[in-house]
């Protein structure tokens, strides 16, 4: 078992990296403002480290240097006329430029707004459109970006005549000698766009108090120890990457090692190499698909223990997407021989509208499941006793973090009893202030007494929260509810498929009835084999829903994803119905 009081052999870390240990007393985000948190962290020797595609150290960036750069940038912002409350849009590239500009905006009293990097799907025009929509939403006084994205960034900014500059151009500006404004806990600290919000973006306004209360609860729940070091490949434009793996380490004075998201996508095992080289205990989070990719990259000829040592991985966080028990078990099977312990898994539940974390599994408890009868999940009446019962494994997402409260409500807004499945509502000190300049959407999900409708479905059991799916994704057929992930997971059991290859949603049939539609990435070129595959999928789905579905085989990499890498069923449905997704032609 892991010895939490073990000493740290800093010799394992790359030469020049910021250290794991520090004489500065640890504080768990007990600050009034985010600027105060960086001021304190800068008094120590810890910091962040940026690594190349192979996981080798490219640049160490101590918190002290980050603060110096941020203060200089704050004076540049003021010199440009940026005032408290103005927005500063930033392309969230994993590197010192973004970090310094983000905190510089905070010191200047402005609201930094992280915007996404381009993805490998969608193309230039789609990315420019996405940036344009988010720039229109946040209405920034300034837009900063890496030089290599200048063409696309300027094209997006030109539509609104926004002052747009590359990092280097901004850093060359003179600094104002004006006094920096003082912040209060209830001032807005930043805007965070919720995952998937491209066509109708929702900028979540988060105050200093809300952020730091959530980080305190998160750190307390993780039982942070002195030897902890964060390893991350998560993008900074997503709440789990920004809040969990940048702002949280600053507020809790933890050293971090970063691998760029695009480098993880190309070489996912570099993530595990970095954990292996970590001289302390590792705290590292990933959505389910990150663990899945690593398991799949291990060949049958490769022995995990010959390359990796994962015995010091204390917190293997799971979040940002539905947690797949089969994927987590496959990861354990692949890496147990390298010292990985299943008890390190730490499922969680959260959303940008709650700053980050709503619930967290206590460290050491690992993944715990409950088998729930399909009929309970669908809200239907008991099945015919002669019909075989089907069950789904639902993952325990832990207990509410400090300061957070959860209620499960029924269709009439009544509070449901223990194990009653309904809509998940949360209230607490870190629930968002509002959606930026969107009172209607704010009122639709946030009540006057502070309860947030998360849009998720779940139930409580013995103080733990279990999430079963998104309410808006539910497929209703003949009055019976079906979860799209149940359909997708069933199809994935056929040979040749992986997570993210299938999107299930409802469409309206010729007679006005709802019908399940299933889009599937197809890697088979033979027409006869495609026809057989379609028929096999159709039978799988019919066995679950009782209805013959529409099955469409589409080219690989067709199905859209959100900025955080999750499958976007809503966008897939829109693209399919608009004709932008072109299925393969298959004879009936």
Segments (PLM) and residue ranges:
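N-lobe entry segment of adenylate-forming
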Residues: 1-61, 65-80, 84, 98, ...
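Conserved pre-ATP/AMP-binding loop-to-beta segment of ANL
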Residues: 46, 175-193, 199-200, 210, ...
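Conserved AMP-binding/adenylate-forming core of the ANL superfamily
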Residues: 49-103, 120-127, 180-182, 203-212
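ANL superfamily adenylate-forming
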Residues: 55, 120-124, 128-134, 139-186, ...
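Conserved AMP-binding/adenylation subdomain of ANL enzymes
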Residues: 212-229, 239-282, 297-303
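AMP-binding/adenylate-forming catalytic core of the ANL superfamily
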Residues: 276, 284, 295, 428, ...
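Conserved AMP-binding/adenylate-forming
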Residues: 314-316, 323-464, 472-474
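Conserved C-terminal "lid"/linker of ANL adenylate-forming enzymes
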Residues: 501-506, 517-518, 538-588
